[in-house]
A protein has these predicted regions:
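Repeat-solenoid scaffold signature
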Residues: 157-189
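Conserved hydrophobic beta-strand positions in leucine-rich repeat
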Residues: 40, 59-63, 82-87, 106-111, ...
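The feature encodes a structural signal of leucine-rich repeats
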Residues: 47-52, 71-74, 96-98, 120-122, ...
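LRR N-terminal entry segment and analogous cap-like coil->beta motifs
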Residues: 35-84, 88-91
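Membrane-proximal C-terminal cap and juxtamembrane stalk of leucine-rich repeat ectodomains
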Residues: 3, 10-24, 28, 34-39, ...
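Leucine-rich repeat
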Residues: 48, 54-57, 69, 77-81, 92-93, 101-105, 117, 125-130, ...
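Consensus "Asn ladder" position of solenoid repeat domains
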Residues: 45, 66, 90, 114, ...
Length: 256
């Protein structure tokens, strides 16, 4: 075998090794796995910031179970091919306005189990491709702006369960034309005018509630688990088991 052919075979073997999935070579960040050319899995790596070396053409980015406190405002501008982003169970306290834009291709975004405190107007930048948004299990999330989801015309599933919401303006939901599923259970709702409007909207749109929340209370035809957190005086005929929200898991910060 000629030296030229031998060298060619060696070079080809080396290239195939570097391109193999999950080895951290090529365009894959050193601390992550890349099971296919457009997926980067950096879950549970103890990361305190976004890893370096994420390929620009990544489409599926898994960053769950780390300690990441923030996402740069231009992150999704840089990674414009991204369609699936999982950031659940980190230490995010806010999402910068403009992180998503009308040009974003993101379809799935999971920000559950973080330390978010509010969802402000413009947070999601009228991203018209977003279909599923998970914001549940943020124990400090107590405020959602009426126009927080404005422009999310393709959003079908919205999860806001087990947060610290005592009120939610009905406009936050009513201006989502494609909404098919909304989760609100496990919040400490206060029975006031805002809640009455929200509850009336949910009664008119009960097909958008999860199946396990559509059960009536004592024949009143109201979704039982949605009332978790209401004081019994504000919700007559509600059993005491629904009078308090289940405890939230406290999201700890890494030790020094």
């Amino acid at each position: 075998m000629s030296p030229c052919v031998c060298w060619l075979q060696l070079t080809l073997a080396l290239l195939l090794t570097l391109a193999a999935p999950g080895r951290g070579g090529g365009n894959c960040p050193a601390t992550c796995l890349c099971p296919d050319p457009h997926t980067v899995d950096c879950s549970a790596r103890g990361l305190t910031r976004l890893p370096e070396g994420i390929p620009l053409d990544v489409r599926r980015l898994l960053l769950s179970d780390n300690w990441i406190p923030r996402i740069p405002a231009d992150f999704l501008v840089l990674y414009s091919d991204l369609v699936y982003l999982d950031l659940r169970n980190n230490t995010l306290s806010r999402v910068e306005a403009g992180t998503l834009s009308t040009a974003s291709r993101l379809v799935f975004l999971d920000l559950g189990s973080n330390n978010l405190t509010e969802i402000a107007q413009g947070t999601f930048g009228e991203s018209r491709s977003l279909i599923k948004l998970r914001l549940g299990n943020n124990p400090y999330l107590s405020a959602v702006d009426e126009d927080a989801f404005l422009g999310l015309t393709s959003l079908r599933e919205l999860e806001l369960e087990r947060n610290a919401l005592s009120t939610l303006h009905v406009g936050a939901l009513s201006q989502l034309p494609s909404l098919r599923l909304v989760r609100l259970e496990g919040n400490p709702w206060v029975c006031n005018c805002n809640f009455a409007s929200l509850f009336a909207w949910l009664m008119d749109n009960r097909q958008k509630l999860p199946n396990d929340i559509k059960q009536p209370i004592r024949g009143q035809g109201t979704p039982a688990r949605l009332l978790i957190g209401l004081p019994s005086s504000g919700a007559p005929d509600v059993d005491s088991e629904w009078a308090a929200a289940p405890p939230h898991r406290r999201h700890l910060t890494p030790k020094d």
